[in-house]
Amino acid sequence: MSENNNKIPSFGLKSNVNSTYNHLETVAKLSIDEKLVNEPPKFVDIKTITPLNVENNGIAQKRIISKRDLRSFHTSSTYSELLNFIIQLSLDIQGKSLKSNFTITKNINSIIVLLNQLDQYITDIPPKQIRTRFGNESFVEWFNKVEKETPKLLFNLINDNPLNTPITNEVPIIYNEISTYLQNSWGDKQRIDYGSGHELNFICFLLCLVKIKFIKREEYELLVLIIFNKYLNMMRRLQESYWLEPAGSHGVWGLDDYHFLPFLFGSSQLIEHKYIRPKSIRNDEIVNSSFSDEYMYLGCIRFIGKVKSGGSLLEHSPMLVDISGVKNWSKVNEGMIKMFKSEVLGKLPIMQHMFFASIIQYIDNPDIIETDEEINQRKPIVTHSFSSCGCINRVPSMFAVANTDKILASTSTTTNNNNNNITSGDHCNDNEQQCSETHNHDHNHNHNHNHNHPPPPPQQQRSYFPLD
């Protein structure tokens, strides 16, 4: 592969190359066992593997319920395998542009065709014209379509059939297991939201393809620079079309309302770049140049500036500005991996939604004992029947916020004529009951299924970027 950095204008920046730095040695120490950081995952034979969860038609299940379960997971080979996979993906794209001269392999192209099919469903299912800042109901229709079609599409993909080949017999249940990860990569259809846990599901989907030997190690760079980048662009389209809420947003004290991995992978792309430094994200000329088409990190900054036009980067993304003060991209990438371990893989609210079955297994460690404090702190997993549940302090889609004036103008007449109506996304309206507006205590109410909510966490929880 060739790079075109010398053909791109430098904007007057000085060379930033440090050829003595060994990034592999640095990030290997972030693995569970640095000697195994480059080891391949445990492979399985999709034709002979014994599926788990047969009683649930092979669909992968959630196994991390408590802090004890999460600590047990962190001691397992599955956790090490997942973390190493992410580190390997990052290492394999170091210094490489999205515009590099790729040779697209047959299986990578098959995944592109599959994603294009799911992308077409967005075109086929336009958003409904409704009055809400908290997600468009058409996302549920799109999600249901994806759930229905994904097992068949994956079966044809993995068995080298044309994607839309009719399937006369029932799809083997192992494909339902793999489908679970891809289906849950797009967000939550009940809450109509999206966050880093859904992004992690897409990585698990790619890991499944590696473990069944559909993808080879030499294709890892294509998984990120082509497949993950395609996924990222699809997610932006979904977020913009259906106004997905950010799940578990840290507000201004987070990297991004929705994503984490584009910053991790994107920082690796920029390691030892001749001109672009971390502080370059504060230069509008660079951010709005062709560099943002080549590097995910800069592309994220440009996208944030586009959709959050109400203030400067410092005002709406101070953490990104803080990170821009780091000396070089290798330290940024190292910090991103540390932060991903602590803020994603180390957080129960995210990891309790991770799926396990026969390909990606939950391996319990009986030596990990749940403490009395952890037992007392146990809370039920929060579930919702629909996004209009008003039981928690939710963050509206930034796309909805950007279009507030347009919505208010188009709905003002209707609002004046229907003063007694309840706006979707502001209150619960099942059985004409409204949720308490204070939400300062546990409560129950009926949304076709009873569910409990503990007190909500602070709306903005600051994350810290690890530099040491």
Curated annotation (Swiss-Prot):
GO process annotations (BP): mitotic spindle organization
Main location: cytoplasm
Keyword tags: Cytoplasm, Isomerase, Rotamase
Taxonomy, superkingdom: Eukaryota
GO cellular component, one term: nucleus
Transmembrane segments: none
Keyword Nucleotide-binding belongs to the record: no
Any one GO molecular function term: peptidyl-prolyl cis-trans isomerase activity
UniProt biased composition (Low complexity): 412-424
InterPro entries, alphabetized: Phstyr_phstse_ac, PTPA_C_lid, PTPA_sf
Catalytic activity: [protein]-peptidylproline (omega=180) = [protein]-peptidylproline (omega=0)
Entry EC no(s): 5.2.1.8
Chain's role: PPIases accelerate the folding of proteins. It catalyzes the cis-trans isomerization of proline imidic peptide bonds in oligopeptides. Acts as a regulatory subunit for PP2A-like phosphatases modulating their activity or substrate specificity, probably by inducing a conformational change in the catalytic subunit, a direct target of the PPIase.
Family: Belongs to the PTPA-type PPIase family.
Stored PANTHER family: SERINE/THREONINE-PROTEIN PHOSPHATASE 2A REGULATORY SUBUNIT B, SERINE_THREONINE-PROTEIN PHOSPHATASE 2A ACTIVATOR 2-RELATED
Name of the featured protein: Probable serine/threonine-protein phosphatase 2A activator 2
UniProt source species: Dictyostelium discoideum
Gene: ppp2r4B
